Amino acid sequence: MSLEERVKEIIAEQLGVEKEKITPEAKFVEDLGADSLDVVELIMAFEEEFGIEIPDEDAEKIQTVGDVINYLKEKVGG
C-alpha cells in the first residue's frame, strides 16, 4: 500500500468519509467535515501509523490531504 493509500485509509476511517471524496485538494475542515478534535486525532493517527512526531507548529500548517501527504513524504520518504 502506498503512502497516499495509507493516508486515505486513515482519513476514511477517522472521519467516516468515502475514499472518493479524499482528494489532495480536499480540506479537512471545509471539505471533509472534520472539527478541531478530528484534526488532532488525525495527526495522532498519522504519527502512530508512520512512527514520527508531528510538532504542533507543523500540524497547524496541514490543512489539506495533499499537505499531509507531502509532509509525510518529506519526513518518512515514500
From Swiss-Prot:
<keyword id="KW-0444">Lipid biosynthesis</keyword>
<dbReference type="GO" id="GO:0009245">
    <property type="term" value="P:lipid A biosynthetic process"/>
</dbReference>
<dbReference type="InterPro" id="IPR036736">
    <property type="entry name" value="ACP-like_sf"/>
</dbReference>
<dbReference type="InterPro" id="IPR006162">
    <property type="entry name" value="Ppantetheine_attach_site"/>
</dbReference>
<comment type="pathway">
    <text>Lipid metabolism; fatty acid biosynthesis.</text>
</comment>
<dbReference type="GO" id="GO:0031177">
    <property type="term" value="F:phosphopantetheine binding"/>
</dbReference>
<keyword id="KW-0275">Fatty acid biosynthesis</keyword>
<comment type="function">
    <text>Carrier of the growing fatty acid chain in fatty acid biosynthesis.</text>
</comment>
<keyword id="KW-0596">Phosphopantetheine</keyword>
<dbReference type="GO" id="GO:0000035">
    <property type="term" value="F:acyl binding"/>
</dbReference>
<dbReference type="InterPro" id="IPR020806">
    <property type="entry name" value="PKS_PP-bd"/>
</dbReference>
<dbReference type="GO" id="GO:0005829">
    <property type="term" value="C:cytosol"/>
</dbReference>
<dbReference type="InterPro" id="IPR003231">
    <property type="entry name" value="ACP"/>
</dbReference>
<dbReference type="InterPro" id="IPR009081">
    <property type="entry name" value="PP-bd_ACP"/>
</dbReference>
<keyword id="KW-0597">Phosphoprotein</keyword>
<feature type="domain" description="Carrier">
    <location>
        <begin position="1"/>
        <end position="76"/>
    </location>
</feature>
<keyword id="KW-0276">Fatty acid metabolism</keyword>
<dbReference type="GO" id="GO:0000036">
    <property type="term" value="F:acyl carrier activity"/>
</dbReference>
<comment type="similarity">
    <text>Belongs to the acyl carrier protein (ACP) family.</text>
</comment>
<dbReference type="GO" id="GO:0016020">
    <property type="term" value="C:membrane"/>
</dbReference>
<protein>
    <recommendedName>
        <fullName>Acyl carrier protein</fullName>
    </recommendedName>
</protein>
<keyword id="KW-0963">Cytoplasm</keyword>
<feature type="modified residue" description="O-(pantetheine 4'-phosphoryl)serine">
    <location>
        <position position="36"/>
    </location>
</feature>
<keyword id="KW-0443">Lipid metabolism</keyword>
<dbReference type="Pfam" id="PF00550">
    <property type="entry name" value="PP-binding"/>
</dbReference>
